[in-house]
């Protein structure tokens, strides 16, 4: 009976953290949408060739960023994201494109480590309270890989896919 009460309390705490995180995401959605619109407009009407605004004709390597939780008690949150990420990696490989896994959250990291899968980048320990600095660190790493020439640089990627839940 005591274990049941503790488990229920932990579930309530997890639920409140998820609600807080979702509230922060919803608050930033208008900004993100406007930024996406502005970048799309620049990319569409610009004649400048830049790796961030041009699509690779023959992609050879893709980055798959899988965003999971650091801890349990979130139901199928992490397992759903990891499963979807696995399917995306398989799809890319079936099309002859090498897929590099970039992982956020201990759940995804532990899943990949347990199965001895390659990890190109990993971040954890901040899913309860993510900050701009955390997002910037991840973005800088992925942008660096995207800008690098995948033809000549093993860390370079031609595509970037992000797997997350809403």
Name the predicted role of every residue range.
Residues 1-166:
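Conserved loop-to-helix interface motifs that mediate assembly, gating, or partner/ligand docking
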